[in-house]
Design a protein with these regions (language model features):
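Alpha-helical scaffolding within the catalytic cores
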Residues: 61-68, 85, 90-95, 160-164
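Surface-exposed patches in mature extracellular/periplasmic domains of secreted proteins
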Residues: 57-67, 109-112, 130-138
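Sec-dependent N-terminal signal peptides
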Residues: 4-14
Length: 218
């Protein structure tokens, strides 16, 4: 008879667990200049779902959108940026991003193919004293829950260049990770968007989960 009482109790506890409000929120960066900051609308929701299921995170399933110059950016420990084209940060936006990053924030820039020539000079406005350096394959970001012994996975081929991961470091802390020639965000999108294979999408999601785990554990 006691077992019969335990069943409703277990169901109640499971219900309470599922009702726990999200403990953290991540954001997509909105910027000026004409580039498509909104390029991959299903990317972050899918990455969040994957992380909540596989890393036991409790991230709000609905990501926020934050302007580069908005002080609200300090509410988000992880900010994702993507696009194909032009990016412009004015002085106030560059200063806001700088303060955010130096205060402990993290920016993931994902080259959606074509972003490179625009984002590098703009990040120089944000952190003029820093240069992007390629992360070695031994860096912890490639060795979180999921192992990537050869660095970033190649999700979309484009012009055949190798995928590379670059970082900006401040006093030894990685505060910006730039995934180049890989298109991680495309791999996070709904399957029908790019018709990537399940294996390719899984590689992209696992690498994205590593980014989240690295940032949340630092």
């Amino acid at each position: 008879m006691r077992k019969l009482f335990l069943i409703p109790l277990v169901l109640l506890l499971l219900g309470l667990q599922s009702a726990v409000p999200p403990s953290v929120e991540i954001a997509l960066l909105k910027y000026r200049g004409g580039g498509d900051w909104y390029a991959n609308p299903t990317s972050l929701p899918n990455l969040i779902e994957f992380c909540n299921q596989n890393l036991n995170t409790n991230i709000n399933p609905d990501n926020a959108t934050v302007d580069a110059g908005d002080p609200q950016i300090f509410n988000y420990p992880f900010v994702h940026m993507t696009g194909h084209g032009n990016v412009v940060f004015d002085d106030q936006e560059a200063r806001n991003l700088r303060n955010y990053l130096l205060a402990g924030g993290f920016l993931h820039i994902d080259d959606n193919y074509g972003l490179d020539v625009y984002i590098r000079p703009q990040m120089k406005k944000v952190l003029p004293e820093l240069d992007f350096v390629e992360l070695p394959y031994s860096h912890p970001i490639y060795h979180q829950k999921y192992e990537f012994p050869n660095g970033l996975p190649k999700i979309h081929e484009h012009d055949g260049k190798p995928a590379q991961g670059f970082g900006l470091f401040w006093e030894g802390r990685l505060l910006c990770f730039y995934s180049y020639e890989t298109d991680l965000g495309d791999g996070w999108e709904d399957p029908e968007v790019h018709n990537d294979s399940p294996e390719t999408r899984l590689k992209a999601l696992k690498m994205g989960a590593n980014l989240i785990q690295y940032v949340f554990s630092e």
